[in-house]
Regions:
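Post-HEXXH active-site segment of zinc metalloproteases
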Residues: 34-60
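Short pre-active-site segment immediately N-terminal to the catalytic Zn-binding motif
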Residues: 10-22
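C-terminal substrate/ligand-recognition segments
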Residues: 173-193
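Long, amphipathic alpha-helical stalk/connector segments used for oligomerization, subunit docking
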Residues: 75-168, 172
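Active-site-proximal, well-structured secondary-structure segments within enzyme catalytic domains
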Residues: 1-11
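Active-site recognition of the HExxH zinc-binding catalytic motif
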Residues: 22-35, 62
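Conserved small/polar residues in nucleotide/adenosyl-binding loops
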Residues: 208-213
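Post-HExxH zinc-binding segment in Zn-dependent metallohydrolases
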Residues: 51-88
Length: 213
């Protein structure tokens, strides 16, 4: 709401703690990026210099924290104790790390692993291009969505809330936004590679004070 408002919202899924953890890490990435913009000096607030370079860069920051940090072995080693204290059925941080990085096909974009995530974006981008160019009637969107999901991911939504209505973007008028996520993934990978070349492996990082209140 203002130049120093960095509050975030997150997703809480009962019985799915990894989902909530990664969602929070993602939104934290957005927040910390905003905190580092020149707009915080107030001098450049609302000016181009004080704004994000692009939404792809913005998403790269959130995806860096979600996929490069929160899914790292070093983070799992440091944070596992919090889950163990809450009755986590996993025996050690190694199992925690493996579980949070499991690869499986699914319907939900925000729950997708890094391997299949790009396919979710490709489906949305292809469909919205067809919509914008007038080649796809909106009433036919659920059918075409389900068809593409079966073709590319081998899964079919049982209802539209699992399918073409699962994202808020189109209902908000945010057409053309989805590629920002995929470009953001690529940028976050480049940041990780540069970081590790300069200062060493992310998995060598020692995290402290990672305890739940």
């Amino acid at each position: 709401l203002g130049p120093r408002d960095f509050r975030i919202t997150t997703r809480i899924v009962e019985g799915e703690p990894f989902s909530s953890l990664l969602a929070t890490a993602h939104e934290w990435g957005h927040s910390i990026y905003e905190q580092g913009l020149p707009a915080q000096s107030h001098q450049w607030f609302s000016w181009p210099l004080g704004q994000a370079t692009s939404m792809a860069v913005h998403e790269s920051q959130s995806l860096f924290w979600e996929n490069r940090i929160a899914k790292s072995k070093a983070f799992a080693k440091s944070f596992f104790g919090n889950f163990a204290d809450q009755g986590c059925p996993l025996d050690n941080y190694q199992e925690f790390w493996q579980s949070i990085n499991v690869v499986k096909k699914g319907l939900n974009r925000v729950e997708a692993d890094e391997l299949s995530y790009g396919l979710h974006i490709i489906i949305r981008t292809e469909l919205e291009i067809e919509l914008i160019e007038g080649n796809l009637n909106p009433k036919d969107l659920p059918y075409e969505w389900n068809k593409k999901y079966q073709e590319l991911l081998g899964v079919t939504p049982s209802n539209d809330s699992e399918g073409c209505l699962q994202d808020v973007h189109w209902s908000e008028g945010a057409f053309g936004y989805f590629p920002s996520y995929l470009i953001g993934h690529l940028i976050s990978a480049q940041i990780s590679d540069t970081l590790e070349n300069d200062v060493g492996s992310i998995n060598a990082v020692s995290y402290t004070h990672l305890t739940l209140p």
